[in-house]
Amino acid sequence: MSRIEPHAIPPELLLKAYRAGIFPMADSRDDPEVFWVEPKMRAILPLEGFHLSRSLARTLRRGKFTVTCNAAFEAVIDACAAPRPGAEESWISARIRESYIGLHEHGHAHSIECWHNGRLVGGLYGVGFARVFCGESMFSREPDASKVALAWLVASLRKVGAELLDCQFTTPHLASLGAVEIPQSQYLQLLSKAQRPYSSGELAAARALADAVGDGLGIGGAGVVKGDAAALGLPAGFAALRAEGAGSSSPGNVIAQSLTHTS
């Protein structure tokens, strides 16, 4: 772990760190400094191993929550940093907050939000690149809200061919949903594999997906540049799933069906 000066981490440096398997944290909400973390053991959630319980499947199908992507990134990170019962402090400092907002503006940090009656009641945010998504934090103000956000995340990542969902540290909550712990050395191998160059077929598929959902993202197939088929990443997968569920009374039906096939 090494200390750096107290100002927002440049997006290029932050993304480079994630590509190398390390990430920043702060000691407290008011800490002006950050330290770089490379855990000896790493939690990941295998995308084909998400545990979809019957109760969560019912919640998805009922459509209790309205789910969005990148609609309220700052509100999500603020909710994740807010004091909670039994956890008054947070590693999400002002510096961490500004750093991830900057990365979001550069297209590599994303959020998923759960709304109920117009109120933000759950969500998560993280960092996306290549075939990788690194989950940073989640919050829930109503039962199952964060689980629904995670279910949409997993289904969306699978839709765009992602291979690695990094959870950083394991918790009982994440373990109940399928997260497992592996040595950092094994994680780095998976990380390297997930960043391999894209094949012409993968680039073509990404362009086709961009054309299909481009209106919702403000882009088209031409926006998929050489070398980064995942430039669209989570938002494209999310938009595609929303489009598939457009004719349903509950878009969550699509998510439940998708995850039931492998859960």
Swiss-Prot record:
Q: Which Pfam families match?
A: Leu_Phe_trans (PF03588)
EC number(s) reported in the record = 2.3.2.6
Q: What is the residue range of the signal peptide feature?
A: none
Q: Which GO terms describe its molecular function?
A: leucyl-tRNA--protein transferase activity
Reactions listed under catalytic activity: N-terminal L-lysyl-[protein] + L-leucyl-tRNA(Leu) = N-terminal L-leucyl-L-lysyl-[protein] + tRNA(Leu) + H(+); N-terminal L-arginyl-[protein] + L-leucyl-tRNA(Leu) = N-terminal L-leucyl-L-arginyl-[protein] + tRNA(Leu) + H(+); L-phenylalanyl-tRNA(Phe) + an N-terminal L-alpha-aminoacyl-[protein] = an N-terminal L-phenylalanyl-L-alpha-aminoacyl-[protein] + tRNA(Phe)
> Keyword Hydrolase on this protein?
no
Ranges in a coiled coil: none
A cellular-component GO term for this protein: cytoplasm
Domain of life per record:
Bacteria
> Per its UniProt entry, what is the enzyme's top EC class, as one word?
transferase
Q: Write down the InterPro entries for this protein, in alphabetical order.
A: Acyl_CoA_acyltransferase, Leu/Phe-tRNA_Trfase, Leu/Phe-tRNA_Trfase_C, Leu/Phe-tRNA_Trfase_N
What keywords are assigned to this protein? Acyltransferase, Cytoplasm, Transferase
Q: Where in the cell is it found?
A: Cytoplasm
Q: What does this protein do?
A: Functions in the N-end rule pathway of protein degradation where it conjugates Leu, Phe and, less efficiently, Met from aminoacyl-tRNAs to the N-termini of proteins containing an N-terminal arginine or lysine.
Q: What is this protein called?
A: Leucyl/phenylalanyl-tRNA--protein transferase
